[in-house]
Amino acid sequence: MAMWSLRRKSSRSVQLRVDSPKEQSYDILSAGGEHVALLPKSVRSLARTILTAATISQAAMKAGKPPSSRLWGEIFDRMTVTLNEYDISASPFHPTDPTRKIVGRALRCIERAPLTHEEMDTRFTIMMYWCCLGHAGYCTVSRLYEKNVRLMDIVGSATGCGISPLPEIESYWKPLCRAVATKGNAAIGDDAELAHYLTNLRESPTGDGESYL
């Protein structure tokens, strides 16, 4: 199924709604178009494609059908192209770049088609999280990521994607992401204490006698 057919099918499926909270899956659909509009232009198209695929997959789940391996192949290919473009881009450094690279490496390793809708749902959520790192500090659906166990395994205990005041972004997340960048694959949660220390060191008087290392 080509991407044009994916878009055509979405026009018939977009009005689907979950009948019961107990049946709810594909939670990223709750984000909706308003949230996508807040994303950077560079990832909006990808985010819309992910939501369309989630809508189609949710309809298949409610009809008792398995997740589509062909649909997953399309989305995986689209995500891979985006990751490749991101890797070679010359855009200015963003404080979440280290996190995006960690998540991107994880996404490249899941080409195998998902066997269950739960697995498909998790993959779509991680992909959307990668998109949402483009507006980290202002994301209104960070709760969806914070409860995703697989995502927490990748990035640690802090997603860095919630709504934060600008001063906190400057004083906390930037030092945190720089600390992650210097350690490579380290989980963000492991570096939180180091980032906190670096921030305090910058703001504290010199020679207070405290040693971290």
Swiss-Prot record:
- A Gene Ontology molecular function term of the record: zinc ion binding
Q: What is its main location?
A: virion
What does its PTM field state?
Phosphorylated.
Induction pattern? Expressed late in the infection cycle.
Instruction: Tell me which Pfam families the record gives.
Output: Gene66 (PF02053)
Q: Can you quote a single GO CC term?
A: viral tegument
- Compartments it resides in: Virion tegument; Host nucleus matrix
Entry keywords, A to Z = Host nucleus, Late protein, Virion, Virion tegument
Query: Organism's domain of life?
Result: Viruses
Query: Which family does this protein fall into?
Result: Belongs to the herpesviridae US10 family.
- Name the chain's protein: Virion protein US10 homolog
